[in-house]
Every structure is written in C-alpha cells, then in structure tokens.
Amino acid sequence: GTLKQVFETILSHQSDAFRQVVLVEYPRRGIWTIGFLTGETLGEVQNITKDRVLNIFIPTTPNPTSGFLLFIPEEDVIELSMGVEEGIKMVMSGGIVTPMDRRSESDRKKPKV
C-alpha cells in the first residue's frame, strides 16, 4: 500500500546519493549511529580542518529524508558491510529490520572499536 510506495520512493532517490553505510559515534562518544557517506568534504570546510573529513548524513527515524549533515574525520568513520538499501530499511524500521552480518567469521571475532 501507501507505506510500500513511500519506502520505494525513498530508496530509489537516496540509494544513488548514499555511497556507503557507516557507523559513527554520535551524538557523543559511546553512542553509535548509522550514517551514510555522501562524499569527501571539499572547499572551505576541508581547508579549515586539520584532518581529512567525510560528509556523513545521519538520517532520522522513520523518515530518512531528514537528518543531519556532519563533517567527520575519516579515522572516526567505520564502513559497514551492509548495503545502502539495507541501511535505509534499518533506519526506517527503527531497528526492527536488521540485516545479517556479511563479514567473514574471522572478521566478526575482531572488534573494530
């Protein structure tokens, strides 16, 4: 029905804009959130910061079309193995829909953080 149409519309428009699903500590250390890499920061913002910074969009639940644009140092961004569509589904469902961990068994045993 209607929810399916909204979901498909959001996926079709945002899947192209979002390059990678990432994990970042936000709004403070020790609290993690899903974000989407939208590009590498360029121009004045990059030139003012001492680190290489990435554009990370932090969506709101259940509507991932609104959210926050954060400029986060690359070293503080963890790339996830889930696809963009899986990440959007996770956000839209409020975490009810959670994709399987696609990493190898050995990688699962090594915490990144």
Where are these regions (language model features)?
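Transmembrane alpha-helices and immediately adjacent membrane-cytoplasm interface residues
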Residues: 1-14
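Terminal membrane-proximal soluble interaction domains of membrane-associated proteins
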Residues: 17-113
